[in-house]
Design a protein with these regions (language model features):
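Glycine-aromatic micro-motifs
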Residues: 2-130
Length: 130
């Protein structure tokens, strides 16, 4: 029996993204959710990069949750780690203003988030268009 995991996706793995059908087409879509304001999303052209930032000082990331089996999660993990991402688990996601799910997200390690000292993160909800 495969263990199921909640995976929060915000870029090319979302419905309509060019990697969705490759990795998540056969997994269970659980809905659109929002992260806590603990991240910064950078539009890197063909895909977004998300960095964790100090709790409560970042942006709210809009994404989708998929319930994935452990084998598929491992396949996605290998792909994401190959691109430099780390898996972060137990992020809290809301729907309608209330915490509804805990999931894993792939984000770049915080040490790669290099910005000028006067850089200000634009607050609010951000979403990457596929």
């Amino acid at each position: 029996m495969n263990n199921l995991k909640n995976l929060f996706v915000y870029g090319t793995l979302k419905e309509g993204g060019h990697l969705h059908d490759v990795y998540l087409k056969d997994q269970t879509f659980m809905g659109v959710y929002y992260s806590e304001p603990d991240y910064f999303m950078h539009d890197h052209g063909p895909f977004p990069i998300v960095f964790p930032v100090k709790k409560g000082t970042g942006q709210i990331i809009q994404g989708e949750i998929y319930e994935v089996d452990s084998s598929k999660f491992g396949t996605v993990k290998t792909m994401e780690e190959g691109a430099g991402y780390d898996v972060m688990t137990d992020i809290f996601l809301s729907k309608g203003g209330m915490i509804h799910r805990v999931a894993s997200i792939f984000a770049y390690p915080p040490q790669y988030f290099k910005v000028p000292l006067d850089f200000e993160i634009k607050k609010g909800v951000v979403s990457w268009a596929v």
